Amino acid sequence: MKCPSCQHNGTRVLDSRPVDDGKSIRRRRECESCHYRFTTFEKVEETPLIVVKKEGVREEFSREKMLRGLIKACEKRPVSLKTLEDMCFDIEKELRNQGCSEVKSELVGEMVMDRLAKIDEVAYVRFASVYRQFKDINVFIDELKDLIKKER
């Protein structure tokens, strides 16, 4: 690796340690020529996961976007941010483990709703009402009936 100070091509690693829950490695380096010390970070470059929307539009998967939707659905509910972050992480991990570079938004939405129904039913209904675009109260009632059936 080139030294940022003198541009010499030889550096040695003084210290390495995992950071960001093991997703990255922090390395302390020293230039063999000028002895300048600097830090580098190394992490795996992930293949982007593409979400295909209902209209056919493609966009890169965003765990942050999914988390924002969940936070909105769980507003004023006894669901911790950690629980929601873990859910988002698990969903992303499951999607990536499928080995596909593209996933349908419907699959992502169903995965969110399956998990949310087990965590908080009110948040589930809130999320489902936006995700499934309930047109009237009857659709809302049908969803509640389905939820009650699943409980029994």
Swiss-Prot record:
Keywords: ATP-binding, DNA-binding, Metal-binding, Nucleotide-binding, Repressor, Transcription, Transcription regulation, Zinc, Zinc-finger
UniProt remark on cofactor binding: Binds 1 zinc ion.
Cofactor(s) required, per the database record: Zn(2+)
MF (Gene Ontology): ATP binding; double-stranded DNA binding; zinc ion binding
Every ATP-cone domain range: 49-139
Zinc finger motifs (unnamed), residue ranges: 3-34
Phenotype of null mutants: Suppresses the synthetic lethality of a dnaA1-yabA deletion for growth on rich medium, increased levels of nucleotides in the cell, increased levels of DNA replication elongation.
Stored InterPro entries: ATP-cone_dom (IPR005144), NrdR-like_N (IPR055173), RNR_NrdR-like (IPR003796)
GO biological process, one term: negative regulation of DNA-templated transcription
Pfam families with a match to the protein in the record: ATP-cone, Zn_ribbon_NrdR
Summary of the function given for this chain in its UniProt record: Negatively regulates transcription of bacterial ribonucleotide reductase nrd genes and operons by binding to NrdR-boxes.
Family, as annotated: Belongs to the NrdR family.
HAMAP family assigned: NrdR
Name of the protein this chain belongs to: Transcriptional repressor NrdR
Organism this protein belongs to: Bacillus subtilis (strain 168)
